[in-house]
């Protein structure tokens, strides 16, 4: 390839990523500038809603993170390695396709006062949940599927599974294997995964608006409400509340690291002391309950929807935005993987590892400054900040595993780098690209805050309509909105899986 073309493609890859990640800079400025005023801090801490909102946020986050980790590790202890683990791993993409808002809507319609459970058992009155425990439990169930999905990758090493089998054969039970072998091996990567879970839970606005607590709400919802007001003083309080979310994330990360360091020092040496094998009934029950929860969510929404139809405009907008955002992200990421840097690009994971609310504030500031708020293209640009890193998470491992000998053979045949990219690497990436498209579409469907702010309310989606209806409205229409929000990603996953199977018939390496 001629040097000018290579430089042009490298520049294009960098420009695409910088345009998408540009809001990180104004987000930092908007968070720091109010923090320099002592009066703004006084106004924030003087607000009577802050202590309860902070407490509800901390409690719901701890319940969600610890619960998701417990469910995932209990299932690993019970099923891994084995055929049942592989069977569950094959069903995880379908569970991940269920958006948080759809799952939360089903939970609301089942357990809330006036829901199905309340109608069946009138004596059952849901207790007041001012600490966000119900929110945390719901997110724990939903996020456990994500943690399990990552664990399927981390536990895919043949060496690790072989060592567990050896421990089993020597008489050590599964809990000893988990404590002495599995956790120490995967702890660094698992820590990053849990950081992403905590970051998402801290800034969950849509799910918290559906499930509560209501008054005062969680800190993310409170910050969202302040930032949405026209008063500059209230907006400063909202920015400081967003900064508090970042500080809470740092605090959770520090506490998690300290717990890991302390726990690692307590690891005993293996002196041959066996413990009796205890049936892992909880893990087996959870492995059955997790897919069942997804199935019940879909059935409940289908029953409650009855003859109600979703908003056609919201359905079309969701489909268009999700398709365009995922396709654009795929093209951009393939360019980035081929012509981007090989090292020192960890900043691309920041949207996953940081609370979403400050990033949306940065996006909105850029859109206002450029006069592009309320535009359809701006809406797609806003979704790319979260669609791109999740799709890169799917694409990057396969890209790095491409056999360099294939590239060497192509080079000896005189192929140019652009020809190698188009005729060798892209066909090899077809299957992960299809999976990435489905993941990107699902991530785009779930976006609430960027859609509402960057679209200026002009482009309703299934997510925004479901959140709006959750505060009051027709149960059937809410169920229909949430059902279609669930069905769209599921249909895309089925479509990409079918295409992958069809293409793999003619390509042995892709089966």
Residue positions per predicted region:
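Membrane-water interface segments at the C-terminal ends of transmembrane alpha-helices
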Residues: 2-35, 45-156, 185, 189-206, ...
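Short amphipathic alpha-helical coupling elements at transmembrane boundaries
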Residues: 39, 43-46, 89, 122, ...
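Loop-to-transmembrane helix entry/capping segments in MFS-fold secondary transporters
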Residues: 86, 166-167, 235-238, 408-410, ...
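Short helix-to-coil transition segments within interhelical loops
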Residues: 156-161, 165-186, 408-429
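Glycine-rich helix-loop "coupling/hinge" segments at transmembrane-helix boundaries
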Residues: 206-233, 446-476
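Helix-loop-helix hairpin linking two adjacent transmembrane segments in secondary transporters
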Residues: 226-243, 247
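Flexible interhelical linker loops that connect adjacent transmembrane helices
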Residues: 259-289
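Short cytosolic juxtamembrane segments of multi-pass membrane proteins
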Residues: 264-276, 457, 500-511
């Amino acid at each position: 390839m001629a040097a000018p073309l290579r430089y042009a493609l490298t520049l294009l890859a960098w420009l695409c990523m910088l345009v998408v990640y540009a809001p990180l800079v104004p987000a930092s400025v908007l968070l720091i500038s109010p923090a320099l005023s002592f009066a703004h801090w006084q106004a924030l801490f003087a607000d009577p809603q802050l202590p309860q909102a902070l407490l509800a946020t901390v409690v719901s986050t701890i319940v969600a993170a610890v619960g998701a980790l417990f469910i995932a590790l209990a299932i690993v202890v019970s099923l891994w390695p084995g055929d049942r683990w592989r069977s569950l791993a094959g069903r995880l993409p379908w569970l991940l396709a269920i958006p948080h808002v759809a799952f939360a809507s089903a939970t609301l319609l089942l357990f809330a006062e006036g829901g199905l459970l309340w109608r069946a058992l009138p004596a059952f009155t849901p207790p007041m949940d001012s600490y966000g425990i119900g929110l945390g439990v719901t997110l724990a169930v939903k996020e456990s599927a994500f943690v399990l999905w990552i664990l399927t990758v981390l536990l895919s090493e043949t060496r690790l599974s072989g060592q567990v089998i050896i421990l089993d054969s020597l008489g050590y039970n599964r809990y000893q294997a988990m404590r002495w072998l599995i956790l120490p091996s995967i702890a660094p990567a698992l820590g990053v995964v849990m950081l992403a879970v905590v970051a998402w839970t801290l800034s969950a606005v849509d799910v918290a608006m559906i499930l509560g607590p209501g008054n005062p709400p969680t800190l993310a919802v409170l910050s969202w409400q302040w930032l949405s007001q026209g008063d500059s003083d209230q907006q400063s309080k909202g920015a400081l509340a967003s900064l508090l979310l970042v500080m809470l994330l740092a605090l959770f990360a520090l506490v998690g690291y300290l717990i890991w360091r302390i726990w690692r020092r307590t690891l005993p040496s293996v002196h041959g002391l066996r413990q009796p094998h205890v049936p892992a009934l909880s893990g087996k029950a959870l492995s059955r309950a997790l897919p069942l929860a997804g199935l019940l969510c879909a059935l409940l929404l289908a029953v409650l929807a009855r003859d109600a139809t979703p908003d056609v405009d919201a359905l079309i907008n969701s489909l268009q935005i999700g398709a365009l955002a995922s396709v654009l992200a795929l093209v951009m990421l393939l360019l980035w993987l081929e012509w981007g840097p090989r090292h020192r690009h960890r900043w691309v994971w920041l949207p996953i590892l940081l609370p979403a609310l400050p990033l949306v504030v940065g996006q909105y500031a850029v859109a206002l400054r450029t006069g592009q708020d309320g535009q359809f293209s701006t809406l797609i640009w806003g979704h790319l900040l979260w669609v791109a890193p999740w799709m890169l998470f799917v694409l990057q491992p396969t890209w790095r595993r491409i056999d360099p000998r294939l590239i060497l053979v192509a080079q000896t045949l005189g192929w140019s780098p652009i020809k190698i990219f188009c005729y060798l690497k892209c066909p090899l990436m077809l299957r992960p690209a299809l999976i990435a498209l489905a993941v990107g579409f699902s991530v785009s469907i779930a976006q609430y805050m960027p859609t509402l702010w960057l679209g200026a309310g002009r482009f309703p989606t299934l997510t925004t309509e479901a959140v709006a209806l959750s505060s009051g409205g027709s149960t059937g229409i809410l169920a229909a909105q949430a059902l279609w929000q669930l069905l769209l990603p599921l249909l895309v996953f089925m479509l990409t899986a079918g295409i992958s199977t069809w293409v793999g018939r003619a390509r042995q390496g892709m089966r």
